[in-house]
Regions:
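Walker A/P-loop phosphate-binding motif and the immediately C-terminal alpha-helix
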Residues: 75-112, 227, 231
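Phosphate-binding loop that captures ATP/GTP phosphates
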Residues: 99-162, 168-170, 175
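Phosphate-binding/switch loop-helix module in NTP-utilizing enzymes
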Residues: 154-200
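Conserved Switch II/interswitch segment of TRAFAC-class P-loop GTPases
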Residues: 180-189, 194, 205-226
Length: 315
């Protein structure tokens, strides 16, 4: 049995199955493994197991482990709005969770650099991401997705006063992080049509955009501007979501429409885009979101509204 065969026999079964090459020279054992589909934690565990298995082998003074992986074909879905306060971040978080519930491998980028909301919405406040080889590793959540947000990188409550290029660089670090096997990245963009949006379009080229608006005319005017930005950037608009659509009184059951009804659907039809559905103005959605538990992770009509949206986006 050769030295290499002897060393191979010492490797854990998973490492043997993933082994690309193994070489012993001058006391250094160099192991190259296929880490396709593994996230950062799984790669770290495998590397530690290999080093432990070979460290005491005769003639081995040093163990070097290199990981190779096929870069996954990742689909970026940008979630935008022309106006703040329309529930875009809530829709982004719940869309990501709903896609994960449908069996997709999903990551969520909080690209609202100046006003990050995802740590609160996903219950990750106070949790900082790790880093590996100058790449950030997403913060895991209880809901089957990883998330990266400036809210996890700065002190809570601290204001960020950066010019456009710095915000664009920050976006790049979030998008180009170690997303492991994620096949879909949902990107929660800031409101408006500024530097971060332009950087997203020019450097990262989303596969499509979901536009969030309330039914009222003022919000729809700005939502139309957001759609025009994506069209100019040659990013397909997947469709328009009408948020805060219809309020059911918890006492009498009467349905009212404080922001109007049907405006987003009519605007989508006018512009030739798909209408992706309505999300109700529901106290339960607000309460769950403030508590860091996305309604899409639960059951009932609130969850079903987001699951229906995810089914339309996933097709």
């Amino acid at each position: 049995m050769s030295d290499n065969d002897a060393l191979k026999s010492l490797l854990p079964p998973l490492a043997q199955a993933r082994l690309q090459s193994l070489r012993l020279a001058d006391g250094a054992a160099t192991v190259i493994l296929d880490a396709s589909g593994f996230d950062g934690i799984e790669r770290d565990r495998l590397e530690a197991a290999v080093k432990e298995a070979l460290a005491a082998a005769p003639g081995v003074r040093e163990v070097r482990v290199a990981m190779m992986a096929d870069k996954p074909k990742r689909r970026i879905i940008a979630v935008g709005s022309g106006k703040g306060g329309v529930g875009k971040s809530t829709v982004s978080a719940n869309l990501a969770v709903a896609l994960a519930r449908l069996g997709r491998k999903v990551g969520l980028v909080d690209a609202d650099i100046y006003g990050p909301s995802q740590p609160r919405l996903l219950g990750t406040e106070g949790k900082r991401p790790d880093a590996r080889e100058k790449q950030l590793i997403p913060v895991p959540t209880e809901f089957g997705i990883g998330v990266l947000s400036m809210g996890n990188l700065i002190e809570p409550g601290k204001a960020i006063a950066w010019r456009g290029p710095m915000a664009g660089n920050a976006l790049g670090q979030l998008v180009d992080a170690d997303w492991g096997a994620a096949e879909i990245l949902v990107v929660d963009l800031p409101p408006g049509t500024g530097d971060v949006q332009l950087t997203m379009l020019q450097r990262h080229k989303p596969a499509g955009a979901v536009i969030v608006s309330t039914p009222q005319d003022l919000a729809l005017i700005d939502a139309t501007r957001a759609m025009q930005l994506f069209e100019v950037g040659q990013v397909p608009v997947i469709g328009l979501v009408e948020n805060m659509a219809g309020y059911v009184c918890p006492h009498c059951g009467e349905v009212s429409d404080p922001f109007g009804r049907g405006g987003a659907e009519a605007e989508a039809a006018r512009l030739g885009h798909a209408f992706l559905g309505r999300i109700p103005l529901d106290m339960a959605i607000r309460q769950a979101s403030d508590a860091g538990v996305p309604p899409a992770a639960g059951e009932g009509p609130q969850a079903e509204a987001f699951l229906a949206l995810a089914r339309r986006v996933a097709t």
